[in-house]
Each structure stands twice: as C-alpha cells, then as structure tokens.
C-alpha cells in the first residue's frame, strides 16, 4: 500500500512538472499574442486635467483677471448605442436640460455611431449642468442616461470689464496671453496640464495613475483699482462733455493718463480712451 502511495505521489509530481513546463513554453512562444488579447479586452481610460491660469490682482488684492471652471458637454455615441432605451433616454434628457437640437443629435449619432467624443456645448457653468446631473443621479431616469460626461476646463473672466483693459490685456481661446500683462507674463501665469490614466477591464477594476496639474502663479501689480476707476471715470466724463464739440465724434480721438507714486515710481493707474470690454 505504501509503495502505491509513493508511486502515485511521483506521478502527480511529474504531472505538475509537465504542466509547468508547458506553461513556460506557451509563455515563451505565444506570450505576446496572449498579452495583446488581454489588452484588447481592456478599456484605456485617459483624460487631461487642465491647469488653472494665475490671477492678475491690483496692489490691494482686487481681482482684475481670474479663471473660472466651466464644462464642455460631451457625447459618447458608442456607449449610448449599447441599448435602444439608452438612446431615447439620453436624447430626452439632453434636450430637456440644454439648448441642443434633437434632430442634430440623432443625425450625428446615425452618421457616427462609434464616436466616443463629440462636444455638444462648450463652456457651461456649474449651474447650467446641475439639472442634468440631477437626472443622471435619479434612480429611475439615470439608468437610461448613458454616454454623456462633462469635460472640465477654465475660462478667463475679467470682473471689472473695461478696467485697465489696455494694461491687463486678454487671452485667446486656448488660454494663451495675447495682449498686455496677459501676454508679457504668459509664462508665469500659465501652468502645466495634468493627466489621469489607467486600464479598465470588464469588472471595472482600474489601476489609475494621476499626475496632478500645476496651476499658474498669480501676478500682483502696483495698480490701485480705486485710483484706476477714478481716472477712467474722468476720461469718460471729459469725452462725454466735449463730444461733437470741435468736430463730430469723441471729445478726443485718443487720451492717455498715468498716475505714478513719486516716492517709489509705482504705477498706480494707467488708462487710455476709448475703452474696450475684456469680456
């Protein structure tokens, strides 16, 4: 009996050895092929994390230029088309909450059924997207709303509209300074985008890696918003008073004014007329 157990033990051991050898050979000869098959069954998740451009402030902290978070409304047709009820539920929710055309969405979906990125609206505020998010989170309606997500970005806003417009300058749509301080100090005000990425399998197991965005630095000027406001108001009053007096048009074609602190050379106000709205 003992001899039979010993023989059985060695047979099992040989079987495991043979199986191990077979696995080694499979990995050597077909490892890359199986690796590609596994990766093909996974979903790659990647998104950009936008940096926040630095603020421009006067000497007392009054904000002359800021960046506010906004959201792009993005449609993933491939995900929405997984079930017919998803298509109807999603389109109904979109047309209920946003100024989008049902016919345009259906037309795009028919022509691009596998599209995973289509921007329906840009630069929406949080208040504008909140009603839709409520529908998404609703236990009954939410399960039929699929393939819609919000892409975050920042929009440049100038709280005082025309104040120090020639000095502050403005940015282009891609968040790059194009004029004034925005352009001159663009490298300081700009940051570096981050990224979040990872692989997701069918069980929604995701090994996620996040590289955080680096925000831009704030820029503090020597301007005094109170003095700046007084200067601009006086320039406006002058031009309103003498408009169409000596000739047709403004009191002056162009007017400029600079207020300097004689003790240290700080520029407290710098204005020119006509004004323009930075927003």
PLM regions and their residue ranges:
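Periplasmic/cell-envelope proteins involved in peptidoglycan metabolism and beta-lactam response
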Residues: 1-279
């Amino acid at each position: 009996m003992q001899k039979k157990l010993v023989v059985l033990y060695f047979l099992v051991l040989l079987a495991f050895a043979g199986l191990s050898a077979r696995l080694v050979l499979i990995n050597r000869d077909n490892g890359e092929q199986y690796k590609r098959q596994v990766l093909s069954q996974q979903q790659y998740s990647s998104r950009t994390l936008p940096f926040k451009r630095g603020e421009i402030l006067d000497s007392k902290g009054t904000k002359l230029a800021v960046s506010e978070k906004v959201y792009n409304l993005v449609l993933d047709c491939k995900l929405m088309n997984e079930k017919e009820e998803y298509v109807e539920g999603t389109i109904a929710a979109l047309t209920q909450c946003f100024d989008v055309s049902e016919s345009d969405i259906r037309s795009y979906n028919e022509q691009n059924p596998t599209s995973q990125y289509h921007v329906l609206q840009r630069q929406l505020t949080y208040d504008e997207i909140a009603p839709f998010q409520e529908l998404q989170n609703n236990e009954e309606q939410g399960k039929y709303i699929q393939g819609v997500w919000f892409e975050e970005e920042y929009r440049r806003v100038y709280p005082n509209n025309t104040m120090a417009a020639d000095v502050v300058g403005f940015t282009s749509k891609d968040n790059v300074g194009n004029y004034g301080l925005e352009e001159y100090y663009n490298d300081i005000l700009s940051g570096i985008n981050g990224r979040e990425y990872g692989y997701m399998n069918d069980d929604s197991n995701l090994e996620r890696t996040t590289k955080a965005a680096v925000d831009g630095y704030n820029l503090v000027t020597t301007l005094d918003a109170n003095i700046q406001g007084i200067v601009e108001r006086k320039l406006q009053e002058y031009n309103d008073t003498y408009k169409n007096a000596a000739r047709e048009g403004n009191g002056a074609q162009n007017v400029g004014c600079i207020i300097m602190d004689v003790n240290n050379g700080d520029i407290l106000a710098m204005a020119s007329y006509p004004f323009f709205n930075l927003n």
